[in-house]
Curated annotation (Swiss-Prot):
Catalytic center residues: D89
pH-linked activity: Optimum pH is 5.5.
Top-rank lineage group of the source organism: Archaea
Binding positions for Zn(2+) per the UniProt entry: C281, C283, C286
Thermal dependence: Optimum temperature is 85 degrees Celsius.
One Pfam entry name: TGT
Keyword Membrane listed: no
Designated name of the protein: tRNA-guanine(15) transglycosylase
Reactions it catalyzes: guanosine(15) in tRNA + 7-cyano-7-deazaguanine = 7-cyano-7-carbaguanosine(15) in tRNA + guanine
Amino acid sequence: MTFEIKHRDAMGRIGILNINGKKIETPTIMPVIHPNPKKQIVSMDLINKLADVIITNSYITYKTKHLREIAEEKGIHKLIGFDKVIVTDSGSFQLGVYGDVEVEPMEIIEFQERIGVDVGTILDIPTPPDVDRERAEKELEETLKRAKASIELKEERGFKLLLNGTVQGSTYLDLRQKSAKEMAKLGFDIYPIGAVVPLMEQYRYRDVAEIIINSKMYLPTNKPVHLFGCGHPMFFALAVALGCDLFDSAAYALYAKDDRYLTERGTLHLEEIKDLKAFPCSCPVCSSYTPKELASLNKKERERLLAEHNLYVTFEEINRIKQAIRDGSLWELVEERVRCHPKLLEAYRVVRKYIDYIEKFDPVTKKSAFFYTGIESMFRPEVLRHKKRLKRLRYEKVYITTVSSSIEKPYHEHLNVVETDVDILIKDPVFGFIPYYIDTVYPLSQHEIPELFDYEKEINKRFVDEFIDWLKKKIGEDNILDIMTYNYYINYFSANKKINADALRIRKMLQYQYGFDIIDDELMNKIKVVRSKTTGRLRQVLDENGEILFSVRSNDNLLIPSEKGAKLLWKKIPFPKYRVVVNKEAEEFAREGRNVFAKFVIDCDEELRPYEEVLVVNEDDELLAYGTTILNGIELREFNYGLAVKVRGGLKINK
């Protein structure tokens, strides 16, 4: 099995999961298929059309004589009528519902291997929510014991099937953490998070969100995570943003039995909407029937068609989430979805407790602008990261001001400011401060914020006050200028000094982007800039010989180094910061400007964020290449497959 990340936003990722030569693009949904074809509501033709992976129950197959005989003779794929990836549950669901199963833990592993399952599951114990701690601990220990035995059996017997190692622990977050840590040590292929269905049935989405995060924090980043039993599309966006890659759904069929109609915003009963002229959906079912026509059909036909609609809308939401990841707008989609139900909003609000961890996985730049959709946006990773990176700038004199909300961004293009060596900090209702000299950098000019209520402003005011206190300690209170002192200073400055404002802007932008003073006082007098002939905006940074050091990327205004710029960064930034270290095998390829793959990475700056500009070096810190990291500092050390750094250029050895 291999797994690689192609696109990402929040903790969500579009990945390619390769199982036995069959490719699955994640995130995705696994429709639950009954192993008895006669009991399957939706035709396998439609399942084959929509799904790359399904999940079925090996325990039912095992306990049903004629199904077991067919599966053992012809294989599970022939029994189901599905040639792509088949995942099986082991009977844990039945164990949770009925309290007992008539199969031994190792026996069901052997059976899953025997019938040709692609991904099997250990017979874990799904501890329900809110049980007493003693029971939760005891059942977790038994699950871990079975997990270890299952891995040992697989290795000893040379089984081909991949294995799910399910994270348990009831509603005790420390037990979920323990379970994740211990499962991770055993080296499972996929990590489901189990026993959350009762919580979702009770709309306890906050508990589910906390369980996901507390499990994810201790699971390996290079393996997919499956949220067992999550089948309602309105929860997918949040779950993906928290790092879930796989879902399974029996909801499409179960809801249809009760005449329930799934939407991405909730569930409707057919009886409630039968008087509508048309369905709020354009799937083949909803395009062919009116609500009244569908309601008038016999029970069996109505159930089949409703199940088909439910399946279509489920996959539609998955596709919508993937597009949001590609666009860099997943947080906006999440904030739209969580307003579908108060309990979902409650779940989203608990995420702020873990935002320091989530920020590590959130890309530093995105295609889409930051849209403020409610007070929850105040705590998003983009805001947290900016507030931290404000302290990267080198301040000497500071003037703090406000501007009218009618002033367009970037501010420096629309304000009549005498440019001096004073750092002008413009108060912002969400981002705290926007420094005048870096106001083009993402997301400082790429955001939209409505007029805020006073209680929203109060949250930001706390940060503003804390940052001013930090400034006073850093540069001294006398160097935070009031308006009279500032006006006097700029008049004096204009008469007595000259400043290369473009060079100062580049210097500040590099400080913000890298955290180090790349352009020192000597270089300040040597660098030149090239501006766009159409927009007048900065496009290139040149050295004294007219050679390009950096290009200013138009969509986010990050500074992208040339070979000479990369050498400057390497000289100014101490090891291991902004480094990705590769082994000797990859040195020649990196120097030739070829992409760096994860299996060649042996070390890195652990603080790297996705899509940052990085330096590729060898173990002796010799600069080999430069480019954009796809993975963060944690993932670079854990992934062993797929693209790690998209290289822009290599440094060939002069012979």
